[in-house]
UniProtKB/Swiss-Prot annotation:
This is Glutamate--tRNA ligase. One of its GO terms (molecular function) is zinc ion binding. ATP binds at K246. NCBIfam families: gltX_bact (TIGR00464). Keywords: Aminoacyl-tRNA synthetase, ATP-binding, Cytoplasm, Ligase, Nucleotide-binding, Protein biosynthesis. It comes from Aromatoleum aromaticum (strain DSM 19018 / LMG 30748 / EbN1).
Amino acid sequence: MASNVRTRFAPSPTGYLHIGGARTALFSWAFARRHGGTFILRIEDTDVARSTPAAVQAILDGMSWLGLDADEGPFYQMQRMDRYKAVIREMLAAGSAYHCYASTEELDRMREEQRARGEKPRYDGRWRPEPGKVLPAMPAGVEPVVRFRNPVEGVVAWDDLVKGRIEIANAELDDLVIARADGTPTYNFCVVVDDCDMGITHVIRGDDHVNNTPRQINILRALGAEVPLYAHLSMILGDDGTKLSKRHGAVSVMQYFDDGYLPEAVINYLARLGWSHGDDEIFTREQFVTWFDLDHITPSAAQFNTEKLNWLNAHYIKHSDDARLAADVASRLARRGVDPEAGPRLESVVALYKERVANLNELADAAELYCVAVHPSDELLAQHLTDAGRAALASLKARLADVAWEKPGLNQAIKDTMAEHSLKMPQVAIPLRVATLGVAQTPAIDAVLEVLGRERVLMRIGRYI
């Protein structure tokens, strides 16, 4: 293990922070925390056409919501252009890079001819300087790209901390463009310079980057830099076994916030996507950091299971502090245009419902019934507020006017009404639920009445008698 572990999360702001990226960030963050190291956030925004400020903010918001705090950064590649160009000049001077004047049309013809011969399309090195080689005359009016002079012999090999030994023959790699004709450096080159300058010791990222790794290793070696250790995480599949995508539901991290998930539930679930600690399924962030290592990451694809995430979320809601849940519900109600102070104390409401919901939106749905005038459906009214039901409510209202407003007294008032009208509990409780909350199913009715309060209960019953 390196004496000072330094990891990084380096998203491109061409879209929002998705679940796969969040897992990569989590594993990189946890590995640094586990070893007392440094976690760096780097925004790879060199794709100017596709990068947006909104996407950058979404990444920062997602990281903040998940509690993945960076020790350094965020660093932005667009602010490091002078550094990249300086390194390119050094490589040109050292002979590890060269100018290529081949036009786009010329390269297209080259690839077509290679395909026609049954060969893999690749740059043929026509502008690569070699001893005794005569290069073509520089064409007028053509701005050259800069290519990395990749080794032509041997293999690039690394012991991937997830996938094991990987070897790629240098003969399979052509000379990568590291600077475009307009002088802007390319992705693979910027990544290498950043990892080198920032002293990254462990690169933990998705396995869609495996093919970039041999090129990056060769550039690092050409710069005389130490090569970091690599750990490539397998992709995440949807419930149906295909690659996770929007059609599987929420894939943006902040969509999970909007959908009512707690960050600790998402963290707990992400931690189990491709990593395990025995049979432990529920654990705190602190436990995860203590237990996390790269040895227990599976090289096979992880499968996203929405039901398991929902189960975890319900668990964390059930065990969350009422005041915290009430604050979240209050903000959700406010975003709906509902005054969260128009009803009883939200702490009392969430305490009633938090063991009955799967997400915070369901909790807000329940709380809303306590804050607004409810309007039962015609079907509920016809089914439950019959003449007998209304008569029972009238008797109950009279009893509730002066009963001690606590569950024992409320329960007794309901029982006395049942006895007076020769009714069973559902024949009184369900009409009462419909009249007070507009629904037929709620927690225990005496608890509902206690939380709703005498004034609201009497007013709501009074509408139906």
